[in-house]
């Protein structure tokens, strides 16, 4: 089994819904982006091309982050996912330096610490962040998704790294990753590339594909097909 994703850049509308869905699903703190994007402009006016390229962990078959991790915190599972044992992470950041995609983040501060602030932004007009937490009976953040904690800490520790897990907790329930389910245009297709009958495998066979940083030789499992062209919409 080799799970991964195909992203159709012709269908992608650049709405950022994938980024928001990921953040909500995985309780990521400010500044931590498991799902992100690259804005790229090429050429000179009037011959200018703009590209919006969604990014995430590529769950590489030959993952550099797994190779360099001194504690085994980064590892591959039987489905081909690149996962992390947060309890084993010592915060050395070797995985971050080794990752050719820049998709691993580091918690320099205590995640979500802004919610511990007991001072209101406007006195006698607003509740403090800490008051909001108390109202919803939470100790970390008011919109916590408890299901994230089924396979990985709901909120990660200070001085540890974190990254996309392809929503492994949702896969265990027979669901697709949150970014895939949230995409309004169906630009993201998740599947098993080792299964020739999967939609993901069929798309890779049908289209000319692109992958990021192939020179790194990590055998990434995120493929991009087509590119946005307004003429193809009509």
Q: Which positions does each model-derived feature cover?
A:
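Non-ligating segments of multi-cofactor redox enzymes
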Residues: 1-234
